[in-house]
Each structure stands twice: as structure tokens, then as C-alpha cells.
Amino acid sequence: MGNNVVVLGTQWGDEGKGKIVDLLTERAKYVVRYQGGHNAGHTLVINGEKTVLHLIPSGILRENVTSIIGNGVVLSPAALMKEMKELEDRGIPVRERLLLSEACPLILDYHVALDNAREKARGAKAIGTTGRGIGPAYEDKVARRGLRVGDLFDKETFAEKLKEVMEYHNFQLVNYYKAEAVDYQKVLDDTMAVADILTSMVVDVSDLLDQARQRGDFVMFEGAQGTLLDIDHGTYPYVTSSNTTAGGVATGSGLGPRYVDYVLGILKAYSTRVGAGPFPAELFDETGEFLCKQGNEFGATTGRRRRTGWLDTVAVRRAVQLNSLSGFCLTKLDVLDGLKEVKLCVAYRMPDGREVTTTPLAADDWKGVEPIYETMPGWSESTFGVKDRSGLPQAALNYIKRIEELTGVPIDIISTGPDRTETMILRDPFDA
């Protein structure tokens, strides 16, 4: 039995993590975010009602679940207050269910200004960030000049630290990026207005998780973005600014790494990517348009159209290695309904003619890489909403089996629609 279960994306994000986390939290007592910020976009559909969460863990909708934002998350007070209000307006008592680590770095207005100024300066070489200040906030954290939730307990010292760091960043904005300076007093006033709310939710997360482990409580760790966007192991520099792999759980929450029991990789039945960066299996034809339309592939956070392509098992195998995956949850299988044939990328052809079955490391090494496909028969029958494996077409079952063969990891959960009831749990991670 696994008490601590990690749910993370195995591709470039947008795999459908939110629904699965919400489904599995029926048995969890805690749900923990351990990296990223409000650049995430987790969509839940419950009884036909759609909820999009960017910062607060997906377990917040559950009455008996405590949601935790761990130290690995960069926290925007403005984004958190907005999300809290939206949920509270719907009758969800967020403050009774949400806890924060005092070590969470704060995202403030100058981080957003820097993010946008840098993307503008890059021009055609822009990374495609969400423009929400995520990267600059992590940069401040590593440079040891960042302000954290815990700093809000001493308001006078916070004001002094803020003044110092803003002088540094405003100098960059004005003199290097030729942008407007950010107003110190406004940032201070806005932050002080919510300081007491933030500090009232602070808890020692590492200690709480250790006590939960000793009691045998079920804990779900909710990843954001996807493995191939990891700052160290992704398609650098077209990556996010945090560790999206399973290793980020320990550093981003304070849980001892030996206590991770099961890692569930969310795997979309095809591939998508938002923004710039390598994508060997990308489709530019009518099939790509079909996947985009049928899958409603527009970002929950940015609204941007996602790039689409066939499932890339070479890249997914890298995710298997990096995360020591226990099992997959296959999502959006129904999007492939109606295609005469489906393809799996099983290898890459390098510019020098070599065939490889492992991914390059840096973005520059992906240049000229061509996908090598294996083609399988598609299916005309609908898989939408199917709740039993026996109800799937044989061609869909063959597709599932081939993914398992190519990756060496079992598919333990199959999602056939956006509602949490439209799911087959073949093996429950908490029972594995």
C-alpha cells in the first residue's frame, strides 16, 4: 500500500493532471503542490461544473481534504487572493482547507515586469513564458534575495528588504530593458494588505507531512507543468523554472525522498506543447488540426493554442527514467476516435542518419531530429465516457498495449472524458 502518491505530467504539460488528482483525493487527507506557481492550469469538471485552478491544489474542492502549498512553489499573493475569492464566492471555505509553507518565495509586481520585459527583449527568440513572474521569482530565490511568506511576520523588516530588492530590479528595468520602474509604495501597500491572511495559513509543512506519514494518512503530491519542461532535464532553455520531475517532491515539500511510494505519470494519448521549443512529433497537417479541435487544445492559463502531434514514446521513456514511474494514467483517448490510423513515434533519426531511442538533452541538440513512426489501425467507435476496459474497441486496446510495451510501464488508469466519473481505475495507486 502506498501512502504518499505523486501525480505528475510526463510530457510538456496539459496532460490532464487536475482531474486525476481530484479523483484520487477521494481517499487522500492532504494534497500538496510542490513546484511551479500560478503558471499552472488545472481544469476540473465535477457534475458538469468547470473549475480552473492555477495555484491552489486541486484537493480544495474536497470537504475532508487539507490542501498545502509547499516551499517549492512561488506564490503570488495577488493570484492567491483572486483564486480564493472565486472559490469562496462559490461557498468553498478556502481558509479552513488551505495551508502554506513559510518558505514559499513571493511573486511580486516587479517579477512580472521583469518577465515581460525579458520576453519582449528576446523578440523572435522568446521562450514563451506565461509572463506571470515565475522565472524571475525563482531567480531571486536562488540568488538569496527573494522575499518569502515567512518574511511577512515582521512587517518592518519586510519593508526594508523590499526596498533593497526593488532598487536592484528597477535599475535593470529602467537602464537595461528601457521599461518603466515599478512603484515601491504600491507593492508594499498591496502586500501588507494581505500579509495577515497569508501568515494565518502558515504551517511547518515538513513536520506536518512526517506526522501524516507516521499516522498512515494518504497524501497526494500534485505536480504542475510536465517532465519535459523540467529546468534541469527538459528541453533547455525552453523549460519552466522549477523541477517538474518526481525529485522535486522532496525538495519542494520537505518530505523525505524515501517515503514516496508511488509515482503516477499522466500521459496524454497524443502530444501537445505550448510555446516555443523542440517537438519532433508535431503535426502541421489536417490531423494536427483535428487533434487540436477535438481535444480543445487551448491553454487553461494563457488561452494559447497548443501545438499538437502524435504520441512520442521516445520522450515518454525519458520521463519514465527521470521519475521512476510506477504507472501511467492515459488521458484523452477519446480524442483519437474516428482516425483511420494512429501513429507512435518510436525513434528519432538524427541529422547524421543515426537512429536513436533516447532524447537529446539541450534544445540545440534537437535541431534536425526527425520522428520515426509506427503506424497502427485506428478505431471508428466512440470511447468517450466508457467506464470499463471491455467496452473499448480492440484497436484502442492494441494501442494501449503497445504504449505499455514501448515504455515498460503499465497503464493503471484510463480517462475517457473530462468528468471524474469518466475514468477506469485498473489499479489504485493507494493500493499498489
UniProtKB/Swiss-Prot annotation:
Binding positions for Mg(2+) per the UniProt entry: 14, 41
PROSITE patterns assigned to the protein according to its UniProt record, in alphabetical order: ADENYLOSUCCIN_SYN_1 (PS01266), ADENYLOSUCCIN_SYN_2 (PS00513)
Q: Which UniProt keywords apply?
A: Cytoplasm, GTP-binding, Ligase, Magnesium, Metal-binding, Nucleotide-binding, Purine biosynthesis
Binding sites annotated in the UniProt record for IMP: 14-17, 39-42, 130, 144, 225, 240, 304
Its subcellular locations are:
Cytoplasm
Cofactor, free-text remark: Binds 1 Mg(2+) ion per subunit.
Q: Where is the active site?
A: 14 (proton acceptor), 42 (proton donor)
Q: Per the record, GO CC terms?
A: cytoplasm
**Known EC number(s)?**
6.3.4.4
The record's annotation in SMART domains points to:
Adenylsucc_synt
Q: Which reaction does it catalyse?
A: IMP + L-aspartate + GTP = N(6)-(1,2-dicarboxyethyl)-AMP + GDP + phosphate + 2 H(+)
Record-annotated residues binding GTP?
13-19, 41-43, 306, 332-334, 415-417
Pfam families reported for this sequence: Adenylsucc_synt
Instruction: Detail which positions bind substrate.
Output: 300-306
Q: Which cofactor does it need?
A: Mg(2+)
GO function term, MF aspect, one: GTP binding
Q: Which residues form the signal peptide?
A: none
Q: Which GO terms describe its biological process?
A: 'de novo' AMP biosynthetic process; IMP metabolic process
Superkingdom to which the source organism belongs:
Bacteria
- Please describe the quaternary structure of this protein: Homodimer.
Question: Main role?
Answer: Plays an important role in the de novo pathway of purine nucleotide biosynthesis. Catalyzes the first committed step in the biosynthesis of AMP from IMP.
Query: HAMAP family attached here?
Result: Adenylosucc_synth
Entry's family note:
Belongs to the adenylosuccinate synthetase family.
Q: What is this protein called?
A: Adenylosuccinate synthetase
Species of origin reads Shigella flexneri
